[in-house]
């Protein structure tokens, strides 16, 4: 079961990744984790990636693909994998397809957790944090008993600067522009499966299970 998981910030991708990994026993492979592991192991590609990252540069695709290849060749990926955060571009998607063919594998599905922008805005701008004790709330999913007041210590709740509407809208726009060509690419290839991410998280996972045939471990 070889999967790629896609979704904009706030779509609930992390939650669904955890559920897929628990149900199917395949490793959750994120770009950040891959880079950190390769650098820790001191592999030639890991050391190359570290040089770029230490300079604040983007890691070139050929290095990233090499690290992905090394990761997918490990024993825990023999029954499948869940790629998250990679590929990010059509060039990376094409390179991934070539690399998988080289090792005799191919993708089964690209799962796209689809949520409208207005719903994402609501989710991402709803976070509130207590100035006093740091407790986290959400205006929709975990509201305080009294608006603007922390349940735990009575402190004032505030919205972080990076959670305000202008910042969130810009982040979503950047991500949407980056992701749309990738969605189109995988749709043309026949791998893409859209899952309605506006439902309850258990219903979202039920839809994913149905797509994957409900074959839990």
Swiss-Prot record:
Binding site for AMP: 31, 36, 57-59, 85-88, 92, 160, 171
UniProt: ATP binding residues: 10-15, 127, 136-137, 199
Gene behind this protein: adk
Transmembrane feature ranges: none
Free-text comment about domains: Consists of three domains, a large central CORE domain and two small peripheral domains, NMPbind and LID, which undergo movements during catalysis. The LID domain closes over the site of phosphoryl transfer upon ATP binding. Assembling and dissambling the active center during each catalytic cycle provides an effective means to prevent ATP hydrolysis. Some bacteria have evolved a zinc-coordinating structure that stabilizes the LID domain.
BP GO annotations: AMP salvage
Keyword ATP-binding: yes
Region (NMP): 30-59
Matching NCBIfam families: adk, PRK00279.1-2, PRK00279.1-3, PRK14527.1
Lineage: Bacteria, Bacillati, Bacillota, Bacilli, Bacillales
Organism: Geobacillus stearothermophilus (Bacillus stearothermophilus)
Subcellular localization: Cytoplasm
Root EC class: transferase
Record-given protein name: Adenylate kinase
